[in-house]
């Protein structure tokens, strides 16, 4: 698969994720996304979060510009925090076919309450 977003100033936000071959499947890879925003599905108010992605590759690595553009698509979307962690996990698993992958979404406090949601995938042996 050719990388079409990296180095392309015309690349637009969409839900496609690009990957590249990676030989060392013993690696543990961590990606922190510190500027995530979406909206409350009830009030429409903005929510801010940090998203952490930890994965052991199954032969594919995640190209991070495509991840950035993917995450931008949620900016105006109303979604419950718990649903977001699972949706991102499912999309990443479909793109990467990893050995293991965990998505943790840490939302900033609202009304004095902070919420974190994690969703994990493990390939069956």
Curated annotation (Swiss-Prot):
A UniProt-annotated Pfam family: QueF
Principal EC category: oxidoreductase
Signal peptide coordinates: none
Record: active site: 40 (thioimide intermediate), 47 (proton donor)
Keyword field: Cytoplasm, NADP, Oxidoreductase, Queuosine biosynthesis
Pathway given in the UniProt record: tRNA modification; tRNA-queuosine biosynthesis
GO biological process: queuosine biosynthetic process; tRNA modification
Family matches, as InterPro entries: GTP-CH-I_C/QueF (IPR043133), NADPH_dep_7-cyano-7-deazaG_red (IPR050084), QueF (IPR029500), QueF_type1 (IPR016856)
Similarity comment text for this entry: Belongs to the GTP cyclohydrolase I family. QueF type 1 subfamily.
HAMAP family the record matches: QueF_type1 (MF_00818)
Name of the featured protein: NADPH-dependent 7-cyano-7-deazaguanine reductase
Record gene name: queF
């Amino acid at each position: 698969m050719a990388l079409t977003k990296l180095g392309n100033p015309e690349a637009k936000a969409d839900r496609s994720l690009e990957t590249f071959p990676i030989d060392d499947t013993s690696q543990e890879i961590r990606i922190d996304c510190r500027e995530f925003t979406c909206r409350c599905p009830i009030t429409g108010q903005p929510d801010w979060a940090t998203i952490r992605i930890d994965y052991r590759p199954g032969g594919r690595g995640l190209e991070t510009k495509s991840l950035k553009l993917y995450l931008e698509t949620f900016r105006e979307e109303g979604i419950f925090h718990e649903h977001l962690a699972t949706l991102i996990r499912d999309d990443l698993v479909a793109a990467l076919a990893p050995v293991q992958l965990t998505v943790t979404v840490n939302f900033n406090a609202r009304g004095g309450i902070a919420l974190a949601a994690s969703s994990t995938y493990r390939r069956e042996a």
